[in-house]
UniProtKB/Swiss-Prot annotation:
The gene is lepA. Belongs to the TRAFAC class translation factor GTPase superfamily. Classic translation factor GTPase family. LepA subfamily. It catalyses: GTP + H2O = GDP + phosphate + H(+). It comes from Pectobacterium carotovorum subsp. carotovorum (strain PC1). Its main location: membrane. The keyword Repressor does not apply. This is Elongation factor 4. One of its GO terms (cellular component) is plasma membrane. PROSITE patterns: G_TR_1, G_TR_2. HAMAP family: LepA. It is found in: Cell inner membrane. GO terms for biological process: positive regulation of translation.
Length: 599
């Protein structure tokens, strides 16, 4: 046991976590030279295309240290994006230590801080590593000072390495073996294994990634899931050396995978505890706290025949991504679909792309909204995650919107631009601290503004130097209204949006203008209106296509022409009463961009 080291690699986006993992795998000989590829742990196509890590991956390697002993390293490569912070906290729960990788050129950024504090809260040993020292812009001494100033951990002897060229990586491993404590727990106690992650394999059923806290797990054991009480047979188990390798036993302190032929997707929930059926543990391990989704959107299959396969796909995906929430929803305009909850907009994009790619679905997304707290006149409190569920205006006593606490780190010269952006987003400054050339800003900004496009705008105003970390703070009373869209006097539920009263006129007008360009012309006039309650705030008309009925009149009496025009007018009027308008897919997407292009 004292030769096992479990650790995660945490860092901000693009500070070189996955490349460092590659080097560690190479040094320990986990893969042959031929099998080695860049970012070997980013196995999903999407991860490779976007160059980001989405899923945490685990690897078990043997490392011969300088003291001549062989250590077993179990490490987990984690994502750096704020939307996937839940993946990071789950990975950290399985470890005793973490490598905090910081780019020696860019220095400390917001996610570095957030992930590091998560690790320190869990009482993990944090080992700072300065990466990318081969860059001409690298300034390791300044960055080491920054780590001490901003993060507050001692970085005077931080290991310096370059994951790309491989310089200094052996020092990282030696420091790791020296500083990170071995796992606690005893092999003789009843088995307790924590499920860190699961995914669905079409042949094997549910595959779980587990960390053995106490006891040992053998092939063929009867395994009991503590929350459900179900008993399964441990058919296969083993480790990843990135490749799946079968073993007969997983010892105390190890991280490995387990297949129990579970067909039911909810059979082994993430964060649950496994134990032996014949000698069960007294109590379950503390799991993970459930994360609350911050952004909700409706997902609907384009053809209603896909509904069943869409439901199965969501089930399989939610097994792999525990932060995804979904419930059935129906809409008059779009038919049957699901209301899904995500941690942020990037998370939403990734989920939609994974559903479309891995499960061959065509989906329509409605505009993302956040959760509002509504106090009705009957003194009830309801939580509303979709504009169509909002009670009528005269039944609402008070509407509260979620406020996010945003921590930003940015170079001094961009401070003015960023403050202007925050004020425009209805933000309130709560703190500002200078660390050398960096400024740490704390703002309270409404969640609805943060999830819409705040991150993109922050990056563009600061030329990519500012970094952001946000978390839900509280609900606060606010003057929000629902803007409905009426097409030919019929409300289209999928196009409604909730916005602040100050912006509502302007948002309504913008939405109506956008719709006008997107709805194809018909044989009759189409009126597009935006309304708050019964009060119309904007209108535009898609003009009808009409035939020139006077072409056949050559000269002739004016009353003859009037008769023909009147006849055409009556015909169009009848047509308008029975005609209905097909809305194109782009019309639903237009609402996503309302308020974006205007600045």
């Amino acid at each position: 046991m004292k030769h096992i080291r479990n650790f995660s690699i945490i860092a901000h986006i693009d500070h070189g976590k996955s490349t460092l993992s590659d080097r560690i795998i190479q040094i320990c000989g986990g893969l042959t030279e031929r099998e080695m590829a860049a970012q070997v742990l980013d196995s999903m196509d999407l991860e490779r295309e976007r160059g980001i890590t989405i899923k945490a991956q685990s690897v078990t390697l043997d490392y011969k240290a300088q003291d001549g002993q062989t250590y077993q390293l179990n490490f987990i490569d984690t994502p750096g994006h704020v939307d996937f912070s839940y993946e990071v906290s789950r990975s950290l729960a399985a470890c005793e230590g973490a490598l905090l990788v910081v780019d020696a050129g860019q220095g400390v950024e917001a996610q570095t801080l957030a992930n590091c504090y998560t690790a320190l809260d869990m009482n993990l040993e944090v080992v700072p590593v300065l990466n990318k020292i081969d860059l001409p812009a690298a300034d390791p001494d300044r960055v080491a000072q920054e780590i001490e100033d901003i993060v507050g951990i001692d970085a005077t002897d931080a290991v310096r390495c370059s994951a790309k060229t491989g310089i200094g990586v052996p020092d990282v491993l030696d420091r790791l073996v020296r500083d990170i404590p071995p796992p606690e727990g005893s092999p003789d106690e009843p088995l307790q294994a924590l499920i860190i992650d699961s995914w669905f394999d079409n042949y094997l059923g549910v595959v779980s990634l587990v960390r053995i806290k106490n006891g040992t797990m053998r092939k063929g054991d009867k395994i009991k899931v503590m929350s459900t009480g179900q008993v399964y047979n441990a058919d296969r188990l083993g480790i990843f050396t990135p490749k799946q390798i079968d073993r007969d036993v997983l010892n105390c302190g190890e991280v490995g995978w387990l297949v129990c032929a579970i067909k039911d997707i909810l059979g082994a929930p993430v964060g649950d505890t496994l134990t032996l059926a014949r000698q069960p543990a007294e109590k379950a391990l503390p799991g993970f706290k459930k994360v609350k989704p911050q952004v909700y959107a409706g997902l609907f299959p384009i053809s209603s025949d896909d509904y069943e396969s869409f439901r199965d796909a969501l089930g399989k995906l939610s097994l792999n991504d525990a932060s995804l929430f979904y419930e059935p929803e129906s809409s008059t305009a779009l038919g049957f679909g699901f209301r899904c909850g995500f941690l942020g907009l990037l998370h939403m994009e990734i989920i939609q792309e994974r559903l479309e790619r891995e499960y061959d679905l065509d989906l329509i997304t409605t505009a993302p909204t956040v959760v509002y707290e509504v106090e009705t006149t009957a003194k009830e409190t309801v939580y509303v995650d979709s504009p169509s569920k909002l009670p009528p205006l005269n039944n609402i006593q008070e509407l509260r919107e979620p406020i996010a606490e945003c921590h930003m780190l940015l170079p001094q010269e961009y401070l003015g631009n960023v403050i202007t952006l925050c004020i425009e987003k209805r933000g309130v400054q709560t703190n500002m601290v200078y660390h050398g050339n960096q400024v740490a800003l704390t703002y309270e900004i409404p969640m609805a503004e943060v999830v819409l496009d705040f991150f993109d705008r922050l990056k563009s105003t600061s030329r990519g130097y500012a970094s952001l970390d946000y978390s839900f703070k509280r609900f606060q009373t606010s003057d929000m209204v629902r803007v409905d869209v009426l097409i030919n006097n019929e409300r289209v539920d999928a196009l409604a949006l909730i916005t602040h009263r100050d912006n509502s006129q302007y948002r309504g007008r913008e939405l109506v203008e956008k719709m006008k360009d997107l709805i194809p012309r018909q044989q009759f006039d189409i009126a597009i209106q935006a309304a708050i309650g019964n009060h119309i705030i904007a209108r535009s008309t898609v003009k009808q296509l009409r035939k020139n009925v006077l072409a056949k009149c050559y000269g002739g009496d004016v009353s003859r022409k009037k008769k023909l025009l009147q006849k055409q007018k009556d015909g169009k009027k009848r047509m308008k009463q029975v005609g209905n308008v097909e809305l194109p897919q782009e019309a639903f997407l237009a609402i996503l961009h309302v308020g974006k292009d205007s600045k």
